[in-house]
Structures are given as structure tokens and as C-alpha cells.
Amino acid sequence: MESSRGPPRVKNKAPAPIQISAEQLLREAVDRQEPALQAPTQRFADLEELHEYQGRKRKEFEDYVRRNRLNMNNWMRYASWELEQKEFRRARSIFERALDVNPTSVVLWIRYIESEMRNRNINHARNLLDRAVTILPRVDKFWYKYVYMEETLGNIQGTRQVFERWMSWEPDEGAWSAYIKLEKRYNEFERARAIFQRFTIVHPEPRNWIKWARFEEEYGTSDLVREVYGMAIETLGEDFMDEKLFIAYAKFEAKLKEYERARAIYKYALDRLPRSKAMALHKAYTTFEKQFGDREGVEDVILSKRRVQYEEQLKENPRNYDVWFDFARLEETSGDPDRVRDIYERAIAQIPPSQEKRHWRRYIYLWIFYAIWEEMEAKDVDRARQIYTECLKLIPHKKFTFAKIWLLKAQFDIRQMDLQAARKTLGQAIGMCPKDKLFRGYIDLERQLFEFVRCRTLYEKQIEWNPANSQSWIKYAELERGLDDSERARAIFELGIDQPMLDMPELVWKAYIDFEEYEGEYDRVRQLYERLLQKTDHVKVWINYARFEINVPEEEEEEEEEEEEERPVSDEAKRRARAVFERAHKVFKEKEMKEERVELLNAWRAFEHTHGSPEDIKKIEEQMPRRVKKRRKLDDDRYEEYMDYVFPADDQAAASLTKILQAAHRWKQTGGQVVP
């Protein structure tokens, strides 16, 4: 009995002939592991299935959060799901319920705020951020999001107010640095200087004084930099001195070639700092003393090394245009114009091997940078003009062109006060290789010169070249509208909508309608809608037509000039809008366009809920359809189910017809006698 107790004894304790490692065991376990089950993809055939699915999911989520209210992940998953369903009010309600449970959850606040920002609900996001920083003022992430949002919206004054609220809590260094960067971005250097003063009082560490000094070095004067370093040394005292502060101070003086001042700073620091705290200071002082040699010689060595590197790369691939860009920038920093020209000339000599535009895209920028350098840096205007000319000769315009080259050449001529040459360049471009971008650039040039007659001519040529471009017609009409020539604008719109090959005709129609509505020509707008409805029965056109009728003011309202006061919709406007809805409903009913009919009824119901009486609302509600499941036979004798709409009005008409047929049948059976 005793021998059976405990683990069996190992008789042979020698190592096994085949050793198995833990890695091998793990690999075999993973290889033999069965794949995890994946949930099948759900697809919804209709709204009824979707609503059923949504109700089921909501019940599941409510069960989760009811069982474990303190688990914020359940709440956030619930709210995220509602956001995916575009149910923003439900999502807000869920977030607020979660905040009632745990108002200090940073992750929950962030999710809530980001959901509002993502959906561009700015005021909601602002209110949430205000609540968050009030409840949790020590959480920097809320403040960062707050100031980022305000600055993104262009509310700089509001951003400053948020920063000031934040600074009253004396946050860490990152917050102060963010405030300073804000003022630097908007060139408010005095404000930034005042913030640095408060910053160094709250956080007097040496690195912060160095930041202030570098700020003054970049935006202030050398005297201000010295004043900052002096204040830092005086404030820190000998107990809190740091070698980094003195190194930065000395490097600043050396940068200004004040070598004696720098040497004095090094000696002052070495005399007062212990050896254990001044190792880097000793090294910096040694390097400083070695820097009295020829600095130009050192720079030449560095430049020569990089030149050799670039030359080796270009030997491997002479058409590596990125290397040519870097090589040219290197020579530009060296300041030798002859070397720069030599590199650019060698670079532009590497013409792409094929006449495919994708091979020329990078190459063409070599010409652009070369011409700009000659004009701006070398001040050689004639050579820059020659570069533009040679580049335009080189491009195979019959196969492709680069509008940017033509436009840059024209802009160069304008900078040289040669307007005729600029016009000649752009005219030549349009004649050789017309492109929409060229037309736009030429028209913008003439518009800036207030040459509106030339603008008209260019628009006419563009439309003649490409009449299918909807934007050309719209821009042309907008030009005439800006010149207060409504008749010409109207004529252009008329020509535009008559074009059979427009790429986006709906944009031209919309612009024409908006133009007439802006001009107050409401009868013309109605005529346009009627003409458009002759071409299409799109439900959006009908809905927009009805909305237009709602917004049309009466004659008495047009005479009064009280634009600030919002007026109620008149009964006549409601009548006109209902007439449009009724016409549309009749059309869709006759053509059996059920989807469009449902969308129209939804818009009609929204209109009645906003402007109608309870009787009108009841009337439209009675017309709303219901979804039913039907079956239909396929070609292979199988049946499939589909969802269809059943309209109450159609059911009533069918019922009435059935009653008439039944009465006729009874009359026939009774031999012509009327049976009640």
C-alpha cells in the first residue's frame, strides 16, 4: 500500500537521447491549436431587421451596464455602438449616465469629448471640456484638448482665456511651454516674455531659464539674453547652480564671437561648482579653447565629405532626382554660385528616358528650383527667363504638359513688370496644350488686374474647348453676377443647363436656382424647378422645391427690411409647399416609385410637424406606409422573400374597388335586381 503512494520513482536518471526545448513545446501547441470561431457577417435586408437588431443590441448593452455599473468599458462600448448607428442623442444620454456613475473617469471624458468633436458638435465639445476642467483641473489632457480645439477654430482670445485658467493651477512645464508656443505662433513676443517670467517663478529649474534665454536669442536682443542669464544665476544662487546653464550662456557668447566673455563665464562657473558637478563644463571649456582654429576649413572638410557621398550615389543612378535636390541644396548653403549652377546644369541634363508624365514629375522640379534660385538668390533675371524658356521647349507638349511651369513663367514675367510677356506665355500655353488649370490661372491673373473683358473672353474659350466642365459655367456666371450683370449671368446659366454632356449637371442647376433665389426672382425659380422636373423625377428635386416654397416671403415681407427678426411661415407659403408635396406624391404613386414615395412622405411629415396643424399631421400620418414581407417567383421556379411597402391609401382604393365588383356580381346573379 505504501509503495503506491506518491509519484513513481525514476530508475534511469540519465539524460534522454532527444532533448525537447520549451520553445519546441510551445510551437507544437500553437501549431495544433484550432482556429478561433469567428462571428458570421450580419447583413440587413430592410429597416425592420435593422430596428430589430438595434433593439436587441440595446437590450444586451443595458443588461451589461445594469449588471456592472462601475465597468466604464461597458458604457463606452454602448455609446460607441450608438455613435456607429448615428444615434447621437442616445450616445450623449449614455455618456451622461456613465458620468453620473463615475465622474472622475478620464478615459470616459475623453471618449465623450472626442465623439462630439468628431461629429463637429463644437458647442457640445466646448461645454464638455469646460465641465471636465472644472471637475478635474489637474488632468492636463483635458486642457490640451481644450486649447487645441479653440485654436483650431481660430478663437485665439478664447484659447488665451483657457490657458490663463490653466496657469492659475500652476501646472507642469509642458503646459507653460504650450502657452508660450501659442504666443510665438502669433508673433505675440511680449506676451510670451511675460509668460516666461511667471513660468520661471513657478518652475525655477535651470532648463526653463535656458528656454527663456533661447527665446530671447531668437526673438529678442543679445542684451535681453544676457539679462535672462544674469537673472537665472542670481535667482538660483550657488546652492542650485547647474553646469548646463553656464554652458548655454558661454555658447551664446561664443556664437556672438565674444570669446573673452565666454571664457570669463567658464572660469566663473568652474571656480564655484564642485568637480563632481562640472564634468560636462570642463569638457565644453576644452572644446571651446580648441575652436580658435580656422572654422572655414572645418566646414570645407564636411562639405567635401558630403560631396563625395552624393557623387557616389549619382554614379550608381544618375537619374536619382532626390539626390540631385540634396546636392543642389548643399551647394546653395556653401554660397558658391558657380558650384550651384554646375550642379543644376548637370541635373537638368539627366532627361527622363521615356515620354511618360510619371517619369517627368520629379525631374521638372529641378528646372523650377533652378529658375527660382537664379531669380531670388543669384539675382540673375535674364538667366532665370532663359531657364523657363528652355524648360518649356524641352517638354513634349503634344503628349503632356505641366501647367505649373507655364504659370510660374507668367508669374515671373509679372514680377518683372512685363504684363504683355505674361499674357503671351499663357496665351501660348492655351493654344498649344489647353488645360483647365491653365485657364483658371490665366483668369485669376486677369481678375486680379480687373480686366473683366479678358476674363469673359477666356471663359468663352474654356467653355468652347471643354463645354462639359460644369465648374467653368458656374464660375463664368459668378463672374457676371459679381459684375452686377444679372442678364448675362442668366444667359450663361441657360446655355450651361442646355449642354447635353455636362459632367455634373446637377451643380449647374443648383447654382442657377441659387442665383435666381438670391436675386429674388422667385417666379423664375419656380420655372426652373418645373423645367428640371421635366428632365428628372428625382425625389430630392421635389423636396427642395417644397422647401423653397416655404422660404419664399410674401410681397408685404419683401418691402419691409427687418432681416434680423425671424418671420413665421405664412399660410400661403404652406399651401404652396403642400401643393408641391401632393404633386410629387401623385407622380410617384402613378409611376409606382415606392422608395421615392416613402422618402417624400418622410419629408412631408417633417414639414407638417414643423409648420402644420394637428389635423394636417394626422392626415399625413395616415398616409405613411408599412413594411411587409412578400414572396415572388424566380425564373428557376424558386421563391424569394423581399420587403415591400404597403400604403394605406392604396389599400383603401383596392377595398373600394372590391366592394364595387362584389355588388356587380350579386346584381348579375339576381338577374338585374338590386339586392341590399
Curated annotation (Swiss-Prot):
- Which InterPro entries has this protein been placed in? HAT, HAT_Syf1-like_N, HAT_Syf1_CNRKL1_C, Syf1-like, TPR-like_helical_dom_sf, TPR_rpt
HAT repeat ranges are 52-84, 86-118, 120-152, 154-185, 187-218, 220-255, 257-291, 301-333, 335-369, 379-415, 417-448, 450-482, 484-518, 520-551, 572-610
> At the top level of its lineage, which domain of life is listed?
Eukaryota
Q: Where is the composition biased (Acidic residues)?
A: 554-566
Primary localisation category: nucleus
The UniProt entry's coiled-coil ranges are none
Pfam families, per the entry: HAT_Syf1_CNRKL1_C, HAT_Syf1_CNRKL1_N
Q: Does the UniProt entry include the keyword Repeat?
A: yes
Subcellular localization, per the record?
Nucleus
This protein's UniProt keywords = mRNA processing, mRNA splicing, Nucleus, Repeat, Spliceosome
Q: Where is this region: Disordered?
A: 554-573
Can you cite a GO biological process for this protein?
spliceosomal complex assembly
Q: Name one GO cellular component term.
A: Prp19 complex
Q: Which family does it belong to?
A: Belongs to the crooked-neck family.
Quaternary structure, per UniProt, is: Associated with the spliceosome.
- Please describe what this protein does: Involved in pre-mRNA splicing and cell cycle progression. Required for the spliceosome assembly and initiation of the DNA replication.
Q: What is this protein called?
A: Pre-mRNA-splicing factor clf1
> Which taxonomic lineage is given here?
Eukaryota, Fungi, Dikarya, Ascomycota, Pezizomycotina
